[in-house]
């Protein structure tokens, strides 16, 4: 999982 990754939102 990349840093800052979420399944809901990726900025």
From Swiss-Prot:
CC per GO annotation: extracellular region
Q: Which domain of life is it from?
A: Eukaryota
Recall the GO molecular function terms of this protein's record.
Answer: toxin activity
Location in the cell: Secreted
Q: What keywords is this UniProt entry annotated with?
A: Amphibian defense peptide, G-protein coupled receptor impairing toxin, Hydroxylation, Secreted, Toxin, Vasoactive, Vasodilator
PTM 4-hydroxyproline: list the residues.
Answer: 2
Tissue expression as described in the entry: Expressed by the skin glands.
GO BP annotations, alphabetical order: defense response; vasodilation
Family listed: Belongs to the bradykinin-related peptide family.
What does this protein do, in the record's words? Produces in vitro relaxation of rat arterial smooth muscle and constriction of intestinal smooth muscle. May target bradykinin receptors (BDKRB).
What name appears for this protein in its UniProt entry? [Val1,Thr6]-bradykinyl-Val,Asp
Q: Which organism is it from?
A: Pithecopus hypochondrialis (Orange-legged leaf frog)
């Amino acid at each position: 999982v990349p840093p800052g990754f979420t399944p809901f939102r990726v900025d």
